[in-house]
């Protein structure tokens, strides 16, 4: 069986074709039950312009969700996706290119076991405890 993970990836819309090609090469977006689903997302944020006015902005992202995956380094598909994200990770303090790539992996024990980039700028991770 092995340890299973939820994998959440966010990339700028401009990078979608490149990641799709990598995922298609490894058959991660194919079939009746693909490893990943994806959706468009508009991130809202505010910034100050040159006149010190507060400006509302939006950034276009593509979000990929994978569930119940074996996400181990050393697997060819995992290494290909991780390498792509590591190439331009999101850093909220980088003013030159404020829109990078990010990923967060959550294990079946609800622990974050790996992350690339400042994922918390897009993903809000919560653990919910409910009564049965």
Predicted regions and their residues:
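Short, extreme N-terminal segment that most often corresponds to the first beta-strand
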Residues: 1-27
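Charged interaction segments
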Residues: 24-132
